[in-house]
Regions:
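Conserved mixed alpha/beta catalytic, RNA-binding, or beta-rich assembly cores of soluble enzyme
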Residues: 2-344
C-alpha cells in the first residue's frame, strides 16, 4: 500500500479502535472508500469535481460541493454492493459480456480467448491476487470493479475462484502482491497478462526481471493511475505495455506523447509498446491488424473519427462486440473537452 492508503487505514483504525476483520478499500471518483460487512464505513474527501465515466455509470450530478459528492460516492458504492454483490460473498465471479468498452478485464478476456495469453494475474476483492486462465473468470472478477488497494479474505469468494479453476495467491490473508502473483503464474505459463496499480508502488521492474529470468512474455497493464506521482509515471513509461489514464494529467502529458496507440479520448488508454499493440489487436476481430500493417502510426481509436483533428485514413473496425474507427494522426495525445476535472 502507498502512503495515502496507509494513512487511510490508520484513520480507520483510530476511528474504530482497530481494523475490522472484514475490510476492503477501493476508490471511486478519486476518493478512497472503506467497506466492511457490506456497508460503507469511511469515505475520503474527493479530489475530482467531475468524471465522465462516473457520471455515465452512476448519474452523478455536476456542480456538487465536497460533502454532497461524498454522499453520491456512498450511494454509488452501496449500489455496487446491493446490486452486484461486490465486497461480499455474493459477488459474481464469471461474466462473458462487456461492461466497459475498453476496460482492462474486458481486453484481457479477449486476449485469453485468442490464445495470445495463457493466464492473467489480477486482483479480486475478498481474495487479493488471483491467477486465472478462464477468460470469463477474469472478466467476472474485473467487470465494474474499481481499484482494490486492500482486502480481507471472503471464504465464498475464494472458494468460487478455486472451483472455477483460478488460484488465490494467499487464501489465508487475501494479500495483494502482483509481483508474487507473476512469479507463481510463470511457474506454469510462459505468456501472461498482469494488472498493476499505477497509484500504488507495485514493482514493475521486478516483474520485468522475472520475465527475463524465465524467458517469458509478460504484458503489463498499468491501471488506477489517478494521483500517480511523476516518478511513478516515468516508471510506468519504462516498464508497462499499456496504461489507463484515468484522471491523471501526468499520464496524458508524459506518456500520451510517446504512445503508439490511443484508445478513446475522454479517458484514454495508451499502448506504449509493440506488445501493447498486439494486446489491443487481440481485442479486435476485424480490421485492426490489417490497418497497422498498412499504415504508420501513431494511431487513435475513437467512435467519432471525423471529429479528431488531423485524423487520416479513417477505417471502421470491430473491437470487442462493437464497431468503432481507427485512424492515424500526426501526434498524440488527442484530448477531449469532456475529461475528468481537475486532472490529478
Amino acid at each position: 500500500v502507498n502512503e495515502e492508503v496507509r494513512r487511510f487505514l490508520a484513520e480507520i483504525e483510530g476511528d474504530m479502535g482497530g481494523l475490522p476483520r472484514d475490510l476492503h478499500i477501493t476508490r471511486m471518483f478519486s476518493s478512497l472508500v472503506a467497506i466492511s460487512n457490506g456497508r460503507v464505513i469511511k469515505v475520503a474527501d474527493p479530489k475530482l469535481e467531475y468524471c465522465p465515466l462516473a457520471s455515465s455509470l452512476y448519474d452523478f450530478p455536476r456542480g456538487l460541493d465536497a460533502e454532497s459528492l461524498r454522499k453520491e460516492i456512498i450511494k454509488a458504492a452501496e449500489r455496487k454492493i446491493s446490486e452486484l454483490g461486490l465486497f461480499t460473498g455474493l459477488r459474481p465471479l464469471h461474466r462473458s459480456t462487456i461492461a466497459i468498452p475498453f476496460g482492462a478485464s474486458e481486453m484481457m478476456m479477449y486476449d485469453l480467448k485468442s490464445g495470445r495469453a495463457e493466464a492473467a494475474v489480477v486482483v479480486c476483492d475478498g481474495a487479493g491476487t488471483v491467477i486465472a486462465e478462464d477468460p470469463h473468470l477474469v472478466q467476472g472478477i474485473g467487470a465494474r470493479m474499481n481499484g482494490v488497494f486492500y482486502t480481507s479474505p471472503i471464504e465464498a469468494v475464494i472458494r468460487g475462484i478455486e472451483e472455477g479453476g483460478g488460484e488465490v495467491l494467499s487464501p489465508e490473508t487475501a494479500r495483494i502482491d502482483q509481483v508474487a502473483g507473476v512469479e507463481r503464474a510463470l511457474g506454469r505459463h510462459g505468456r501472461i497478462d498482469v494488472t498493476v496499480s499505477g497509484f500504488c508502488g507495485e514493482g514493475l521492474r521486478e516483474i520485468r526481471e522475472l520475465e527475463s529470468e524465465r524467458g517469458a512474455s509478460v504484458t503489463i497493464l498499468a491501471v488506477c493511475t489517478t494521483g500517480a506521482s511523476e516518478e511513478r509515471v516515468r516508471e510506468i513509461g519504462e516498464f508497462a505495455d499499456l496504461v489507463w489514464s484515468c484522471a491523471s494529467g501526468k499520464v496524458r502529458g508524459v506518456l500520451g506523447r510517446r504512445a503508439r496507440l490511443q484508445i478513446a479520448t475522454k479517458i484514454p488508454v495508451y499502448a506504449l509498446t509493440d506488445r501493447g499493440l498486439d494486446f489491443a489487436a487481440s481485442y479486435s476481430s476485424k480490421g485492426f491488424r490489417e490497418y497497422i500493417s498498412e499504415f504508420e502510426g501513431p494511431y487513435i481509436i475513437s467512435g467519432r473519427c471525423g471529429a479528431i483533428p488531423g485524423a487520416r485514413d479513417c477505417r471502421r473496425i470491430r473491437m470487442g462486440d462493437f464497431e468503432t474507427y481507427i485512424a492515424r494522426v500526426e501526434s498524440l495525445p488527442i484530448r477531449s473537452g469532456d475529461e475528468p476535472r481537475p486532472l490529478l
